[in-house]
Design a protein with these regions (language model features):
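Active-site and adjacent substrate-binding regions of carbohydrate-active enzymes
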Residues: 1-430
């Protein structure tokens, strides 16, 4: 396989809101990241993947972008970001931007215009459908609970949102949308970024029939077969590669939930002209129950081991592996795959790190993983901020699918908030 710098790198993911607060306002920021660049250099990090720092109402903690060319004010300014790029590059650290283009915020100007009227020039930037028998266009459920469709009284139509209702899906069938995305990507490449981590990129192509999904355990149909690895996804990515990616010496990794070995080879095959690598989630989904991640069921170690071996063997010489156990969407790896009892926490963390760093592929370290940070185990719903956790708690308990007590145990084990607590820079106890 061809030698590339990203094959020899160690990537460190920063969740900016909770990484380092430089001004005491309780929110992590860009200047805080700059302050810790020497620490990251000493740690052996070559690439920083930073979760979204662009303008956003923060409904989904920045994965709902309202302006693709502005920095979120609480994180800093464009000048701060440019300084971060400069200072990181001085230390031979590259910067990977989180690219969120399956959807925008409903407060993005494109959507504000789109919902005004059926003949607005931005109408087809999003996916609008008429009601069917006075109800949603199909039975799809959203990834964060509830229906994937939201009724808009202004034009008496529904718009699609595979995530929060404040995250309307872009219509990638529209060539103008794709060009807007490519122009924005070029803007950031010209700023000097070194690549993109592409959020839920496998969902940008939808089956244009929009059929009902299969009813699994739950209240809504599964959108997966019709919106994940859709009919034109590889065409779109090859176009993106031709228009943008091939013109820069950058690294790309796509978030591709549910990807198979065969699909991964399509996304990241060296002769495919799409992405450099993908995130597969088979290993972190090991042990999921009837309601997906919301379970107290433990993972099977042998199954986990076999999954890791399979991906190593099947991608050998065909595509490049991304190696990770945790990120901003996963519970803490020590709590999930090791033992976070104080007696075993450190040993578990070292064992898991050894596992990841000794395999072939590019390893990704999530902030705090190097310290063996653990789940937080909040036992009250009001302590949670994650929209996914809150929505599913309400949906599952109100429908009777789970008792509040059982669902709370699921949140304690699986909520995304477990990974989003403040980075533990010292041993000082925090009190309200």
């Amino acid at each position: 396989m061809e030698k590339k710098w990203w094959k020899e790198s160690v990537v460190y993911q920063i969740y900016p809101k909770s990484f380092k607060d430089s001004n005491g306002d309780g929110v992590g920021d860009i200047r805080g990241i700059i302050q810790k660049l020497d620490y990251l250099k000493e740690l052996g990090v070559n690439v920083l993947w930073i979760s979204p720092m662009l303008e956003s109402p923060q409904d989904d903690n920045g994965y709902d972008i309202s302006d693709y060319r502005r920095i979120y004010e609480e994180y800093g300014t464009m000048e701060d970001y440019e300084e971060l790029l400069c200072e990181a590059h001085k230390r031979s650290i590259r910067i990977l931007m989180d690219l969120v283009v399956n959807h925008t915020s409903d407060e993005h100007n494109w959507f504000i215009e789109s919902r005004k009227s059926k003949d607005n020039p931005y109408r087809d930037y999003y996916i609008w459908k008429d009601p069917v028998n006075g109800k949603e266009p199909n039975n799809w459920g959203g990834a964060f609970g509830g229906s994937a469709w939201e009724y808009d009284p202004q034009t008496q139509m529904y718009y699609l949102h595979l995530f929060s209702k404040k995250q309307p899906d872009l219509n990638w069938e529209n060539e103008k949308v794709r060009q807007e995305v490519y122009d924005m990507m070029k803007f950031w490449c010209e700023k000097g970024i070194d690549g993109f981590r592409m959020d839920v990129i496998s969902m940008i192509s939808k089956d244009q029939r929009f059929p009902d999904g299969e009813m699994n355990n739950g209240l809504y149909g599964d959108f997966g077969p019709y919106s994940v690895h859709g009919p034109r996804v590889h065409e779109f990515l090859q176009e993106m590669n031709h228009e943008v990616l091939s013109k820069y010496d950058i690294m790309t990794v796509g978030e591709t939930a549910g990807v198979t070995i065969e699909e991964a080879q399509k996304y990241a095959g060296e002769d495919r002209n799409e992405l450099n690598m993908v995130f597969q989630f088979e290993h972190v989904e090991s042990g999921c129950g009837d309601y997906g991640k919301w379970t107290t069921q433990k993972y099977d170690f042998k199954e986990f081991k076999n999954i890791m071996i399979k991906w190593q063997e099947k991608l050998q010489g065909k595509a490049w592996n991304s190696l990770f156990l945790g990120n901003h969407d996963q519970p803490r790896s020590v709590s999930r795959f090791g033992n976070d009892n104080p007696v075993y926490r450190e040993t578990s963390a070292k064992m898991l790190a050894t596992c990841i760093h000794m395999m072939q592929g590019t390893p990704y370290v999530y902030q705090g993983e190097e310290l063996g940070m653990t789940n937080v185990y909040f036992d009250k719903l009001e302590d949670y901020r994650d929209i996914e956790s809150i929505n599913y708690f309400e949906e599952f308990t109100e429908s009777g699918l789970m008792t509040p007590e059982h669902m709370m145990k699921c949140l304690m084990l699986r909520s995304r908030d477990n990974a989003r607590t403040p980075m533990q820079w010292d041993a000082v106890s925090y009190t309200h």
